Curated annotation (Swiss-Prot):
Catalysed reactions, as listed in the record: cis-3-hydroxy-L-proline = 1-pyrroline-2-carboxylate + H2O
GO BP term, pick one: 4-hydroxyproline catabolic process
Top-level EC class: lyase
UniProt protein name: Cis-3-hydroxy-L-proline dehydratase
pH-activity dependence text: Optimum pH is 8-9.5.
Cofactor(s) the protein requires to work: Fe(3+)
Gene expressing this chain: lhpI
Species of provenance: Pseudomonas aeruginosa (strain ATCC 15692 / DSM 22644 / CIP 104116 / JCM 14847 / LMG 12228 / 1C / PRS 101 / PAO1)
Length: 580
């Protein structure tokens, strides 16, 4: 065997592995990007699309997109389909958390290591061996690993604990709280947090059903007597809890998905069932220290509301809710909320509402995991719906927990405030050419015939219902096109009280509550549908992998026209046309 190329990485989760190295220069969201049953990469925009992760050492710069990646990784580990190891450029708390939960609750291990600036060296090697805190890169298959006892978990490093923390860790508040505290402390050590803080509220994303492992996790905690210590809301779940049977959802999904929701309700969470908790009457407030999972909600809370939350992984969300404590790290700290990248947006003149998700998706691709500040939108003064669409798109194509829009968002009245008085590390300029490229990535179908219009990802707001009702008033959808909107029970009730539901029902629209498009499949996605249309950049990115359909992308008015006429316009919108 030839001499190996040696790297000493930072160990995030201990363990050993040897085998084929699967390298990509692009971050990967495990949720929506990896099938939890087969371990196939299903993100059709990713360079590893179609490859299988099982048994390979996966090398990616980091995660991106969904907080549910930790849940998918747990499914892979407990189902015996996980990668042999994960090698990262930068620490990824979502992936690390999935492996930590596997160790703490189920005694299963998956090594994760961080290589920093040396990550790109992996591109030249097809084989790797991780053992004894060292990574060997090989041109040929390395020797097999020798059997060895499991590595002991470090328990001495971590934050300072107060008396309450110590009582939780000692089991004085129950076994569920003790297990939750162990997980919180392991993540705090990984983050380098010096202490824990009290939190005011939590939003749980782990209620999305990804398979039996996530249900087993929740029911284990519930059966140990788990109870949340702070007001806790639930994300959109995987089914419409009240109507999944009449909607024709198979019991094989409906029953465990409903059971997962019940487990979190039994722990004291509220039945909010929304991926847009910022639309609830009692939402987070500026300056509050909160623990929110669900990527779009995290971005909105930090950026628009001015609350303080990290991009919490599934499972970490409920662990913090059960203890009422979170590591003082990341976006809980002033300095970690400052922008690092400046993105200057050229004046494009008149645009439609599709501008904001297109721009958000592009900014996520450009910012390289660093918090961006967007300059050039002050005169447009985007409203909350526009910022919601922008943030959801940004959170899909990147791992960032927040953004600033100069002159619009609360912590960015000017450039100096957004950057904490420092100069940007990078400055990028965005014009029509780059936006056209992003649009074409989202508007990926060649077909113009539309079978389904999918709205409400993230969940529709009351103002979006009003806009849609105005566009649909006095009209009827094409008989061969379904138009389906997902939203929360609370917002649907507001839309009904305002008279918008009657207008939409006369148009032929269908409403689904409790769940969202990223969790829906057949029959709510019609089995015969080949091409869907959406105004959501998030769903346009994920749908080809999640439901195997072609996707057209447009603003809300374009979606309504497609629902009426049965076809989408070919080519670019006017504000992106080559003639501008």
């Amino acid at each position: 065997m030839k001499h190996a190329h040696l790297i000493v990485p930072r160990t995030l989760v201990a363990g050993s592995a040897s085998g084929e190295l699967l390298y990509a220069p692009t971050g990967l969201s495990f949720w929506g990007g990896v099938d939890p049953r087969s371990a196939e990469v299903i993100d059709r925009h990713h360079p590893l699309s179609g490859r299988h992760l099982h048994g390979r050492l996966l090398a990616i710069p980091g995660g991106r997109g969904s907080c549910t990646g930790s849940s998918v990784l747990l499914e892979l580990i407990l189902g015996g389909r996980a990668p042999a190891a994960i090698l990262l450029r930068e620490p990824d708390e979502i992936l690390a958390l999935g492996a930590i939960v596997a160790e703490e609750l189920f005694g299963r291990s998956l090594p994760i290591a961080c290589l920093g600036e040396r990550f790109d060296e992996l591109a030249a090697y097809p084989w790797a061996r991780l053992a004894d805190g060292r990574l060997e890169l090989h041109r040929d298959a390395p020797p097999p690993l020798e059997a060895r006892p499991a590595e002991a978990l470090a328990t001495d490093a971590g934050p300072r604990l107060d008396a309450f923390d110590q009582a939780l860790l000692a089991g004085e508040h129950g076994e569920a709280a003790r297990l939750a505290m162990r997980i919180v402390l392991r993540m705090a050590a990984l983050q380098g947090a010096q202490r824990l803080i009290d939190i005011q509220r939590a939003h749980i994303d782990a209620c999305i059903y990804t398979g039996p492992a996530g249900l087993r996790f929740a029911e284990t905690l519930r059966d140990l007597g788990a109870r949340v210590r702070v007001p806790t809301t639930l994300n959109a779940i995987s089914v419409d809890q009240r109507r999944w049977r009449e909607q024709g959802v198979p019991a094989a999904l409906g029953e465990p998905a409903a059971a997962l929701a019940r487990a979190y309700l039994d722990m004291g969470a509220q039945p909010s069932f929304t991926c847009a908790p910022y639309l609830l009457d009692d939402s987070a407030r500026a300056g509050e220290q909160i623990v929110w999972a669900e990527s779009n909600a995290v971005l909105f809370a930090n950026s628009v509301l001015g609350a303080r939350t990290n991009k919490y992984a599934d499972f970490m969300d409920i662990c913090c809710a059960l203890t009422g404590r979170a590591p003082l790290a990341g976006c809980h700290l002033d300095e970690q909320r400052q922008a690092r990248v400046l993105i200057e947006v050229e004046d494009l003149g008149s645009v439609d509402d599709a501008f904001y998700p297109t721009l958000g998706y592009l900014c996520g691709l450009l910012c390289d995991g660093q918090i961006p500040a967007i300059d050039g939108l002050r005169q447009r003064q985007p409203d909350h719906d526009a910022l919601k669409a922008f943030g959801a798109a940004l959170g899909t194509s990147s791992s960032v927990p927040m953004f600033h829009v100069i002159g619009v968002t609360p912590e960015a009245p000017d450039l100096a405030s957004a950057f904490g008085g420092r100069a940007p590390r990078r400055t990028l300029r965005v014009g029509r050419e780059r936006l056209r490229d992003a649009w074409r990535e989202l508007d990926s179908a060649g077909e113009t015939r539309i079978d389904l219009v999918a709205l409400g990802n993230p969940h529709f707001s009351a103002s979006e219902f009003a806009q849609l009702a105005a566009l649909c008033h006095g009209r009827r959808r094409h008989p061969e096109v379904a138009l389906v909107i997902t939203s929360s029970r609370q917002v649907v009730a507001q839309a009904e009280a305002a008279g918008h539901l009657a207008t939409l029902q006369a148009f032929g629209a269908r409403l689904v509550t409790d769940t969202c498009w990223c969790m829906l499949d057949e029959p709510l996605v019609p089995p015969g549908a080949r091409t869907l249309m959406t105004n959501s950049a998030k769903y346009a990115h994920y749908a080809p992998g999640l439901v195997g359909r072609q996707v057209r992308f447009a603003g809300l008015a374009g979606c309504v026209e497609a629902a009426v006429g049965g076809r989408s316009p070919a080519g670019l919108p006017a504000w992106l046309s080559e003639d501008c």
